[in-house]
């Protein structure tokens, strides 16, 4: 069933399109929510989502899928986040349309290339495959989700540093009074400005944990157990941790090659 759709496990142009957050040939989207001018009124898209949920509960899966598509075409659909668009592939799976569901996941992966969306999509791919009992193949997306979460927090750290330096420049230019003298300092920018953003330390902590052997082991242990490969968890965690620590940019085919050293996922 997945023979045509799993070309992403081989080095090919299709794999690149599915696996990496590079500039796609379609309009780039993100999961950022746009504000609505009629915030006081009930969102038509969200109303349709609720109707889809009720149809799903009634096990009317085909009708639920169509209702989701209506929601995505609604005039206020730009308010929807990627997690709400990830419902369609899972509903298609429930309707027995597994190939169509996997295709929908890959299309979302091409359209929503921001690191926040990419992490969610990779994790949903893992869930989708596990529901298909494709446990070995799910391992790759379990690890790919970690990679995208690392990229997300690296971006968060960089944003915190940039914001700190920008505020310092504004204070110097307009002679603003310092308002953070009594705030706790969590680090310093390369320019020497004190970082008082409390989230900065959280992002650094998450990065350290995600890249560590223990952190990787903890994240993949359950998935390895489902694949009946629990004994390979430690050596795989060792290699993945080393990869995360040594590289600044991650590629799906490189992750796949590391996994192939321990597990045959084809």
Which role fits each region the language model picked out?
Residues 1-41:
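Long, contiguous interaction/recruitment modules in multidomain scaffold/adaptor proteins
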Residues 38-73:
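Alpha-helical segment of the N-proximal tetratricopeptide repeat
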Residues 40-50, 78-86, 115-122:
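Generic helix N-cap/helix-start motif at coil->alpha-helix transitions
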Residues 68, 74-76, 105, 111-116, ...:
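Alpha-helical junction/boundary sensor with strong preference for TPR arrays
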């Amino acid at each position: 069933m997945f023979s045509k759709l799993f070309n992403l496990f081989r080095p090919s142009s299709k794999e690149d399109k599915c696996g990496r957050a590079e500039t796609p040939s379609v309009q780039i989207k993100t999961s950022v929510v746009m504000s609505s001018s009629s915030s006081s009124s009930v969102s038509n898209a969200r109303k349709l989502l609720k109707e889809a949920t009720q149809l799903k509960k009634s096990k009317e899966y085909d009708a639920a899928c169509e209702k989701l598509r209506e929601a995505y075409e609604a005039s206020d659909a730009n308010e929807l986040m990627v997690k709400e668009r990830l419902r369609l592939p899972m509903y298609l799976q429930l309707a027995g349309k597994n190939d169509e569901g996997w295709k929908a996941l890959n299309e979302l992966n091409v359209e929503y290339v921001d690191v926040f969306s990419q992490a969610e999509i990779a994790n949903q791919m893992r869930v989708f495959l596990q529901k298909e009992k494709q446990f070995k193949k799910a391992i790759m997306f379990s690890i790919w989700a970690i990679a995208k979460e690392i990229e997300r927090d690296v971006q968060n750290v960089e944003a915190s540093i940039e914001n700190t330096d920008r505020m310092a420049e504004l204070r110097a230019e307009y002679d603003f009074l310092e308002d953070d003298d009594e705030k706790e300092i969590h680090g310093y920018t390369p320019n020497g400005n004190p970082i008082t953003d409390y989230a900065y330390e959280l992002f650094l902590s998450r990065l350290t944990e995600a890249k560590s052997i223990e952190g990787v082991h903890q994240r993949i242990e359950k998935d390895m157990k489902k694949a009946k490969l629990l004994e390979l968890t430690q050596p795989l965690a060792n290699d993945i941790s080393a990869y995360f620590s040594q590289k600044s940019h991650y590629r799906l085919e490189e992750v796949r090659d590391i996994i192939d050293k321990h597990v045959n996922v084809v």
